[in-house]
Amino acid sequence: MSTIIDIIGREVLDSRGNPTVEATAVLESGVVASAIVPSGASTGANEALELRDGDKKRFLGKGVLKAVENINTKIADLLIGEESEDQVRIDRLMIEADGTENKSNLGANAILAVSLAVARATAIEKEMPLYRYLGGVNAKVLPVPLMNVINGGAHADNELDFQEFMIVPVCGGSFKEALRAGVETFHVLKSVLKEKGYSTNVGDEGGFAPALRETKEALDMLMLAIDKAGYTPGEDIFIALDAASSEFYKDGKYLFEKRELTSDDMIILYEEIVGTYPVISIEDGLAENDWEGWKNLTQALGNKVQLVGDDLFTTNPKIIKEGIKNNIANSVLIKLNQIGTLTETLDAIEMARINNYTAIISHRSGESEDTFIADLAVATNAGQIKTGSASRTDRVAKYNQLIRIEEELGENAIFKGKQAFKKFQFEE
């Protein structure tokens, strides 16, 4: 009864008001399920290709009618009659039909939407929660949230070079209580910013984008907010950074806070930050093509903090494998739309796990009401999730889904808190 009888694509809007792709899978049993794909603002050079129309008369060239048409014709023709529960085959058929390294023929947005819709339909067909269908009986770890509360870089119109300043609540013994600590700190941060005369408008991911000039200012604001909210920095709540440094890397130099820095200079900067603030995680600390610098960064800080590859790895198992071989980074950011199928995403997570790298399930800056990544985080026992701040429904939807999952799991639910980072210096 899990035979696919129809696949439908449509153009919908993401949280930035840009078109994106939704796919619906219809099974013989009558089950109907849909999935919406996200879209990123700062993208890695090796990401799978998001197919856009380029017609300036529609949505300023950002329409996705070609991708939708590919779903309604080529992909539908390919998958109708297939068994939805054979996810590996479903994804392989689409990859082979596309025939390109970066899914530029059918579009990664078309392929991924169908991949996720089929998985969701199969879970409903089997009368299982999505996390249970994807992860089996052992899916029970709720993730520590990395909450992006101050925005800079490509996500904001201020002078901060680093893209994200995150709070990482690890206290409370449960996801719900840790989330509460993060939310309370977010609200206190708002009042701290207001008191100091800064704007409290929120950016794409629900964080604030105040007109701060220096990294130190942003970190000091976080420390103050954590403390004023009644929590202990470095005990209850840690700090995480996404430098997104490929965005300010040019001609072999990093243009950071109006200075030209080398890779070694950046490493010294991070050592100073880690020595001064309770920073537990640094994402894309160096540029995606600066592999020599990454080796040195990993050597310098790899046993102290989580060094996350996002643009560096683009959720691509081949690139992750190469990075592991070269002792680069110690953590992988997982974004479904960077690679473009559920199967390849699960492969990337597994590759991280068997090589003792942590995996962080992540949203994109252009999101939707779709909560697939919340279930994926629990399904894979990843232990960490990045899905924005404590405002904007497109971000909060994921947190609410995780609250539901934790409640459903009851006493079987595990929240690791600080132990999610046990391989680093904050081991209990």
From Swiss-Prot:
One of its GO terms (cellular component) is cell surface. CDD domains: enolase. (2R)-2-phosphoglycerate binds at residues 163, 335, 364-365, 386. It is found in: Cytoplasm; Secreted; Cell surface. The active site is at 205 (proton donor), 335 (proton acceptor). Its cofactor is Mg(2+). One of its GO terms (biological process) is glycolytic process. Pathway: Carbohydrate degradation; glycolysis; pyruvate from D-glyceraldehyde 3-phosphate: step 4/5. Its EC number is 4.2.1.11. PROSITE patterns: ENOLASE. SUPFAM superfamilies: Enolase C-terminal domain-like, Enolase N-terminal domain-like. It comes from the Bacteria. Keywords: Cytoplasm, Glycolysis, Lyase, Magnesium, Metal-binding, Secreted. Mg(2+) binds at residues 242, 283, 310. SMART domains: Enolase_C (SM01192), Enolase_N (SM01193). It catalyses: (2R)-2-phosphoglycerate = phosphoenolpyruvate + H2O. The keyword Transferase does not apply. Its main location: cytoplasm. Binds a second Mg(2+) ion via substrate during catalysis. Catalyzes the reversible conversion of 2-phosphoglycerate (2-PG) into phosphoenolpyruvate (PEP). It is essential for the degradation of carbohydrates via glycolysis. Belongs to the enolase family. This is Enolase. The lineage of its organism: Bacteria, Pseudomonadati, Aquificota, Aquificia, Aquificales.
